[in-house]
């Protein structure tokens, strides 16, 4: 953690959740509000089909809501896609962009990610930009090269701490139960911090850097204690209020 940066916990429900799941969301919101939520910020990115209903359910609670992806255009003939403006209208304040599953399954490259970031800003959303290496890239000692390329290509020149959050998610750790070592995470987050400070000046010191990759209640304290880790991008552990709020409690106590 960094003392001068307010921690941020982001939950990504992925393609999970129905109307019945809104009870868990409400429990998370209540827990965040009563769990010294002013000490940190919490976000849940629900499926687009739940976003509007989730917004109405929370009715002004301190829990933030986000989308999991957006198109790079504001509108148009893109069957099945959702624009950033649509997410904003439905109640989102943030949107995940460039998640490893989008980069690998849908072959979204840095240029597409960058265009989506700009679309998110245009709609008034904060972009949560994901970067990370594959197992093959890790085994070939290309981690820093890959991250440098993704940072350069995915972030527009007018990136600020107000419009962007960065999440480092080693692809090989997502949903596998594996996590990088604390030493490796510290090195990577220091590298990211150095890169964004070199490019964006002092603004780079203010941008929140999250770690994502099998973040669980049992690993939260160790991960959130690492220097330059300003929060977490949480997958499966965000689906249940008891798990997500346990991580929130760890964050509160640090």
Curated annotation (Swiss-Prot):
The keyword Cytoplasm applies. The active site is at 99 (electrophile), 169 (proton acceptor). PROSITE patterns: TIM_1, TIM_2. It comes from the Bacteria. GO terms for biological process: gluconeogenesis; glyceraldehyde-3-phosphate biosynthetic process; glycerol catabolic process; glycolytic process. GO terms for cellular component: cytosol. The keyword Isomerase applies. It is found in: Cytoplasm. Its EC number is 5.3.1.1. It catalyses: D-glyceraldehyde 3-phosphate = dihydroxyacetone phosphate. Pfam families: TIM. Its main location: cytoplasm. GO terms for molecular function: triose-phosphate isomerase activity. Substrate binds at residues 12-14, 175, 214, 235-236. Involved in the gluconeogenesis. Catalyzes stereospecifically the conversion of dihydroxyacetone phosphate (DHAP) to D-glyceraldehyde-3-phosphate (G3P). Belongs to the triosephosphate isomerase family. This is Triosephosphate isomerase. It comes from Bartonella tribocorum (strain CIP 105476 / IBS 506). The lineage of its organism: Bacteria, Pseudomonadati, Pseudomonadota, Alphaproteobacteria, Hyphomicrobiales.
């Amino acid at each position: 953690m960094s003392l001068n940066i307010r921690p941020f916990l982001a939950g990504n429900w992925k393609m999970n959740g129905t109307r019945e799941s809104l009870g868990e969301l409400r429990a998370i919101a209540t827990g965040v509000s009563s769990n010294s939520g002013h000490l940190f910020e919490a976000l849940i990115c629900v499926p687009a089909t739940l976003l509007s209903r989730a917004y109405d359910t929370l009715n002004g609670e301190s829990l933030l809501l986000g989308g999991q992806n957006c198109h790079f255009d504001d509108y148009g003939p893109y069957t099945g896609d959702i624009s950033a403006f649509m997410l904003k209208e439905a109640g989102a304040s943030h949107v995940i962009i460039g998640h490893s599953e989008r980069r690998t399954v849908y072959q979204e490259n840095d240029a597409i990610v960058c265009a989506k970031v700009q679309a998110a800003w245009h709609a008034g959303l904060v972009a949560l930009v994901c970067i990370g290496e594959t197992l093959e890239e890790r085994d070939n000692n290309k981690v820093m090269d890959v991250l440098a390329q993704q940072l350069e290509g995915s972030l527009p020149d007018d990136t600020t701490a107000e419009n962007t959050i960065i999440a480092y998610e080693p692809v090989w750790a997502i949903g596998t139960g594996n996590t990088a070592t604390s030493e490796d995470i510290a090195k990577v987050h220091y590298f990211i911090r150095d890169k964004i400070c070199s490019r964006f000046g002092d603004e780079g010191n203010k941008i929140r850097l999250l770690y994502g990759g099998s973040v669980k209640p049992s690993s939260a304290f160790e991960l959130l204690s690492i220097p330059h880790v300003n929060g977490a991008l949480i997958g499966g552990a965000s689906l249940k209020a008891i798990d997500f709020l346990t991580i929130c409690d760890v964050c509160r106590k640090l």
